Amino acid sequence: MDSPCPVAVGLPGHTNGTGGTSSPTCNQSMIKLAPYSPEATAAFATAITLMMLITIVGNILVIIAVLTSRSLRGPQNLFLVSLAAADILVATLIIPFSLANELMGYWYFRSVWCEIYLALDVLFCTSSIVHLCAISLDRYMSISRAVTYGPKRTPKRIKCAILVVWLISAVISFPPLLSMNKNKGGGESGALPQCQLNDERWYILYSTIGSFFAPCLIMILVYMRIYQIAKQRTRCPPGEPRKEAPANATTPQHKIQNGRGDETPGTLQKKARPPTLAVSQVESVQQAANTPIANNLLQAPSTTLTPTTPCPSPSPSNSSEVAPSKSKEGKKEKKKKKNNKNKNKKEPDNNNGESMSSDSDTEQGGRGLEVPCTPTMTPSGIHSPATMQKYRDMIATAKGAKLVARKAKQDGTPNSARRKAMVNREKRFTFVLAVVIGVFVICWFPFFFSYSLQAVCPESCALPEPLFKFFFWIGYCNSCLNPVIYTIFNKDFRRAFKKILCKNTKGTFF
């Protein structure tokens, strides 16, 4: 085998040790040392250069978008700024030297820079995944402890957390500076200088676990917990009433008050149609609506009822409908109530959408109820617009009153709309971060797994060198993917990027 040139290869007019020109043997060795053909070298260099440009430009756009867009100015997005800065450093300080080392087949630069280069490579890669781990923990705290954690999530605290992330990354990447196993080459052996990854077993296990596997496990567990919490809140959102039971179901027992102040449980069967309670023919709609009920969900807050005359107790019945009374007394009472109908207002109960406005309801157990028939009402607040709005769903009929059961309307105040928009933005942001973490794991797992095999079984588990290099460069590709993910999956970033790129650049940042 021809011996390689004793010093740096590829310099024009290079002389040998005797002062003459390079020998044909040296020139042949130079050709043999080239790892790729000229065509492959040009294609590889073009692809990696394009990747570097996308990484730098895309992550600069991310930083500008977070710092200038109102919808992205939350303190938690400072994590994305730091993550984008790490990706920019990878594209400017790591990938160019890795590309030169790959295409030339040896380390052209000084050995001191090799030490710094390897340490920075591990530092930036570790900081990326530790950033993602910190972001996932921040997501979990904001979802599980929204009330207490929200006020604590200040820009100052987030910046302190980012500083801790970089310190942890530095602790993991610092040992290579103490113990490096580099193949410097040169000297008497004539070998070319190399700058390779540390192949000491202790450091391989230390760096792979600290830089990838431990943070990856934390992120997976945290996002599993986030998914469980989100699923629970989808079924029963906090602060909202539970959904109504199906129309053919039996409602739980309700407690209604009779004229003596006793609480009597009653069970009503829901029908397929809206529930209607028949009332006595001698009672008007207004009388039926004036029955005092314990549940006052629809009752005007300023309305006061004072029962004066109890109704006669009807016979026990297991039905929710009461037979009409045909007494003369009732007819007189009916005429009297018709004359005073403008003085009274309906006050139905809205317990789970059931109408309980009959003046002669009976409990299911068979005991009759005395319900007051002539309550008096204080005039304050009865005819206010708010009170009229509450009874919009009441439909008066000749036999009584019928309530159309429907779900309570959502609060339409600006605060609730703002809160809903914030919750939706948090959901979208959580989904985008889940995609970012998933892509990161897919890109870097093959490299870290194959690298750890060198410590576990260096001889039997060794991968082919081309495959290991492929995994190595796939990991670097992750640095340019985050801006693409933000653009595809988050409309806030998409809107911010469009605003940055399409606005008039006169007098602006550019």
UniProtKB/Swiss-Prot annotation:
<feature type="transmembrane region" description="Helical; Name=7">
    <location>
        <begin position="466"/>
        <end position="489"/>
    </location>
</feature>
<keyword id="KW-0325">Glycoprotein</keyword>
<protein>
    <recommendedName>
        <fullName>Alpha-2B adrenergic receptor</fullName>
    </recommendedName>
</protein>
<keyword id="KW-0812">Transmembrane</keyword>
<dbReference type="Pfam" id="PF00001">
    <property type="entry name" value="7tm_1"/>
</dbReference>
<feature type="topological domain" description="Extracellular">
    <location>
        <begin position="457"/>
        <end position="465"/>
    </location>
</feature>
<dbReference type="GO" id="GO:0071881">
    <property type="term" value="P:adenylate cyclase-inhibiting adrenergic receptor signaling pathway"/>
</dbReference>
<keyword id="KW-0675">Receptor</keyword>
<feature type="topological domain" description="Extracellular">
    <location>
        <begin position="105"/>
        <end position="114"/>
    </location>
</feature>
<feature type="transmembrane region" description="Helical; Name=4">
    <location>
        <begin position="160"/>
        <end position="184"/>
    </location>
</feature>
<feature type="compositionally biased region" description="Low complexity">
    <location>
        <begin position="316"/>
        <end position="325"/>
    </location>
</feature>
<keyword id="KW-0564">Palmitate</keyword>
<feature type="topological domain" description="Extracellular">
    <location>
        <begin position="185"/>
        <end position="200"/>
    </location>
</feature>
<feature type="transmembrane region" description="Helical; Name=5">
    <location>
        <begin position="201"/>
        <end position="224"/>
    </location>
</feature>
<feature type="region of interest" description="Disordered">
    <location>
        <begin position="234"/>
        <end position="284"/>
    </location>
</feature>
<feature type="site" description="Implicated in catechol agonist binding">
    <location>
        <position position="207"/>
    </location>
</feature>
<feature type="transmembrane region" description="Helical; Name=2">
    <location>
        <begin position="79"/>
        <end position="104"/>
    </location>
</feature>
<dbReference type="InterPro" id="IPR000276">
    <property type="entry name" value="GPCR_Rhodpsn"/>
</dbReference>
<dbReference type="GO" id="GO:0051379">
    <property type="term" value="F:epinephrine binding"/>
</dbReference>
<feature type="site" description="Implicated in catechol agonist binding">
    <location>
        <position position="211"/>
    </location>
</feature>
<feature type="compositionally biased region" description="Basic residues">
    <location>
        <begin position="333"/>
        <end position="344"/>
    </location>
</feature>
<keyword id="KW-0449">Lipoprotein</keyword>
<feature type="transmembrane region" description="Helical; Name=1">
    <location>
        <begin position="42"/>
        <end position="67"/>
    </location>
</feature>
<keyword id="KW-1015">Disulfide bond</keyword>
<dbReference type="GO" id="GO:0004936">
    <property type="term" value="F:alpha-adrenergic receptor activity"/>
</dbReference>
<feature type="glycosylation site" description="N-linked (GlcNAc...) asparagine">
    <location>
        <position position="16"/>
    </location>
</feature>
<keyword id="KW-0472">Membrane</keyword>
<feature type="topological domain" description="Cytoplasmic">
    <location>
        <begin position="490"/>
        <end position="510"/>
    </location>
</feature>
<feature type="disulfide bond">
    <location>
        <begin position="114"/>
        <end position="195"/>
    </location>
</feature>
<feature type="topological domain" description="Extracellular">
    <location>
        <begin position="1"/>
        <end position="41"/>
    </location>
</feature>
<comment type="similarity">
    <text>Belongs to the G-protein coupled receptor 1 family. Adrenergic receptor subfamily. ADRA2B sub-subfamily.</text>
</comment>
<dbReference type="GO" id="GO:0004938">
    <property type="term" value="F:alpha2-adrenergic receptor activity"/>
</dbReference>
<keyword id="KW-1133">Transmembrane helix</keyword>
<feature type="site" description="Implicated in ligand binding">
    <location>
        <position position="121"/>
    </location>
</feature>
<dbReference type="GO" id="GO:0005886">
    <property type="term" value="C:plasma membrane"/>
</dbReference>
<keyword id="KW-0297">G-protein coupled receptor</keyword>
<feature type="topological domain" description="Cytoplasmic">
    <location>
        <begin position="68"/>
        <end position="78"/>
    </location>
</feature>
<comment type="function">
    <text>Alpha-2 adrenergic receptors mediate the catecholamine-induced inhibition of adenylate cyclase through the action of G proteins. The order of potency for this receptor is norepinephrine &gt; epinephrine.</text>
</comment>
<feature type="glycosylation site" description="N-linked (GlcNAc...) asparagine">
    <location>
        <position position="27"/>
    </location>
</feature>
<dbReference type="InterPro" id="IPR017452">
    <property type="entry name" value="GPCR_Rhodpsn_7TM"/>
</dbReference>
<keyword id="KW-1003">Cell membrane</keyword>
<feature type="transmembrane region" description="Helical; Name=6">
    <location>
        <begin position="433"/>
        <end position="456"/>
    </location>
</feature>
